[in-house]
Amino acid sequence: MAEWHKIIEDISKNNNFEDAAIVDYKTTKNVLAAIPNRTFAKINPGEVIPLITNHNILKPLIGQKFCIVYTNSLMDENTYAMELLTGYAPVSPIVIARTHTALIFLMGKPTTSRRDVYRTCRDHATRVRATGN
C-alpha cells in the first residue's frame, strides 16, 4: 500500500520524532516502510510475533534493542496501542498502534512527551483503520 510511505514521510518531516516504521503483522511480519538506517528499520519477524501474541510481555526486543512496556492495550479493539520506553539512554517514548493489517511504530525524541507520541501514532492508525487497512 502506497499510503504507508506517505505516513512515514509525514512523520519524518516532524522534528519531534526520532524514528518510525510500519510493519505487517498478519502475513509476512516484515517492515513495509521505515525511516532508513534507524532502529525500527531493523525490526524482524521474531520481534513482531511476541508483541501480538504475548499480552504480558515486559521487555520486548524492537529493532534489536530492549524496550520497557509502559501500557499494553495493543490487541484491544478500542485502544489498539502499546506505550513503551527505550531501555537504554537517552530514554525516549515509543508507541505501537495497530491497524487491521499492520503495526505503526513511532519513537519520539527524549524531549518529546509520551502524550504527543501517543496522539500522533493513534491518529495515523485511526485514519488507516477508517480505510479498512
From Swiss-Prot:
Alphabetic keyword roster: Actin-binding, Actin-dependent inwards viral transport, Cytoplasmic inwards viral transport, Host cytoplasm, Host-virus interaction, Virus entry into host cell
InterPro entries named among the record's database cross-references: PFN (IPR048278), PFN_euk (IPR005455), PFN_sf (IPR036140), Profilin_CS (IPR027310)
Domain of life: Viruses
Entry GO CC: host cell; host cell cytoplasm
SUPFAM superfamilies on file: Profilin (actin-binding protein)
GO terms classed as biological process: actin-dependent intracellular transport of virus towards nucleus; symbiont entry into host cell
GO molecular function term, any single one: actin binding
Entry annotated with the keyword Chaperone: no
Location of the protein in the cell: Host cytoplasm
Pfam families recorded: Profilin
Subunit structure: Interacts with host TPM1. Interacts with protein A25.
Family: Belongs to the profilin family.
Role noted for this protein: Participates in either intracellular transport of viral proteins or intercellular spread of the virus. Cellular profilins modulate actin filament dynamics (polymerization and depolymerization) via direct binding to actin through an actin-binding domain as well as by modulation of other actin-binding proteins. In contrast to cellular homologs, the poxvirus profilins seem to bind actin only weakly.
Name of the featured protein: Profilin
Encoding gene per record: OPG171
